[in-house]
Amino acid sequence: MNKTASCELLLFVSGEAGLTLAELSALTEMSKQACQQQIDYLKEKYHSDEESALTIIETAGKYRMATKEEFAEILKNYAKTPLNQSLSKSALEVLSIIAYKQPLTRLEIDHLRGVNSSGVLSTLRAFDLVEKVGQVEAPGRPSLYATTDFFLDYIGINHLDELPEIDESRFIAEEQTLFNESEENENQ
């Protein structure tokens, strides 16, 4: 079995966790010195190959495959684009709230939704649809959230003024009807 390919395979499948020289040595049944030679060879091979986007890096004593720095912008764009991933209903709900009422704090979002929105906000920030835009001058200095320019691109508009109008009075009336029905059912 090819020693170089074995090291390359193991670095590939280890992903972001990476492998120490000792782990690589144990898995390939090669000496640490032989593994180091294979890693050095692969580093040079990737470095000199302009057709390859890969490199091998060492972080905290672990080796792992990574992409070359010059491809960072492409990866950043890929990470921003949901592609085959779709936003959950709760993420769409929070995104809508922020789009129409921005800027606002997580607590304001939680109050409107009736549930904690921390996880959803993290997801929306990871997709670069929402960002922190400041802090409220109040105890705890809570962060204010607003949509990003990427959000506008994502939904295909140029400015927030292009968002469809919503009739809040209709939603309030519907909520009141549901609340009244719930009370009537409890009293029966």
Swiss-Prot record:
- Annotated localization: Cytoplasm
> What highest taxon heads this organism's lineage?
Bacteria
Q: Which Gene3D superfamilies match?
A: Winged helix-like DNA-binding domain superfamily/Winged helix DNA-binding domain (1.10.10.10)
Which InterPro entries does the protein's record reference?
ScpB_csome_segregation (IPR005234), WH-like_DNA-bd_sf (IPR036388), WH_DNA-bd_sf (IPR036390)
> Which GO terms of type biological process are on file?
cell division; chromosome separation; DNA replication
Question: What coarse category fits the chief subcellular location reported for this protein?
Answer: cytoplasm
GO terms under cellular component? cytoplasm
Which pairs of Cys residues are joined through disulfide bonds in the record?
none
Q: What does this protein do?
A: Participates in chromosomal partition during cell division. May act via the formation of a condensin-like complex containing Smc and ScpA that pull DNA away from mid-cell into both cell halves.
Family label: Belongs to the ScpB family.
The protein in question is named Segregation and condensation protein B
Which organism does this sequence originate in? Lactococcus lactis subsp. lactis (strain IL1403)
